[in-house]
């Protein structure tokens, strides 16, 4: 099956965060593609990617970026697909700069912004499953199963002292 989710990042170093997105998409059985697309270094490539995404069969774009983090917003400006922004944790400001860059979008160009770092990367994949589930019931079921397993794991291990 061709990719339904595009996972893009501003630089190769962002893979340490976005790899968690890929891992969760794999667990959910959602087909995806991965690409480095920089809003600042390769803006023409970004515009082309965003403009052609829907025609290539993508239904959701997950965009992770650190620092100025313009990738999710610029991507959202060039597509009508849902764009999920993942702020990458930076050494300088711990990702708060990225979070604020992604979350403060002007009205009319929405970006669904997730948490900073690994949690946001994982949740972006889960949110993708929720979005895709309306059209593709197998991803809704995969998400339900993931949540049930998560609940079961907690209930099976109520004492944190048990290894």
UniProtKB/Swiss-Prot annotation:
Residues bound to substrate: 11, 14, 41
Signal peptide range in chain numbering: none
Keywords for this protein: Isomerase, Purine biosynthesis
Any one GO BP annotation for this protein: 'de novo' IMP biosynthetic process
Family matches, as InterPro entries: PurE_ClassI, PurE_dom, PurE_prokaryotes
Pfam families: AIRC (PF00731)
Gene Ontology molecular function: 5-(carboxyamino)imidazole ribonucleotide mutase activity
SS bond partners: none
EC number: 5.4.99.18
Reaction catalysis annotation: 5-carboxyamino-1-(5-phospho-D-ribosyl)imidazole + H(+) = 5-amino-1-(5-phospho-D-ribosyl)imidazole-4-carboxylate
Top EC class, one word: isomerase
The protein's annotated pathway: Purine metabolism; IMP biosynthesis via de novo pathway; 5-amino-1-(5-phospho-D-ribosyl)imidazole-4-carboxylate from 5-amino-1-(5-phospho-D-ribosyl)imidazole (N5-CAIR route): step 2/2
PANTHER family: PHOSPHORIBOSYLAMINOIMIDAZOLE CARBOXYLASE, PHOSPHORIBOSYLAMINOIMIDAZOLE CARBOXYLASE CATALYTIC SUBUNIT
The family this protein is said to belong to: Belongs to the AIR carboxylase family. Class I subfamily.
Described purpose of this protein according to its UniProt entry: Catalyzes the conversion of N5-carboxyaminoimidazole ribonucleotide (N5-CAIR) to 4-carboxy-5-aminoimidazole ribonucleotide (CAIR).
NCBIfam families registered for this protein in UniProt: purE (TIGR01162)
Name this polypeptide is given: N5-carboxyaminoimidazole ribonucleotide mutase
Organism: Pseudomonas aeruginosa (strain ATCC 15692 / DSM 22644 / CIP 104116 / JCM 14847 / LMG 12228 / 1C / PRS 101 / PAO1)
Protein's gene: purE
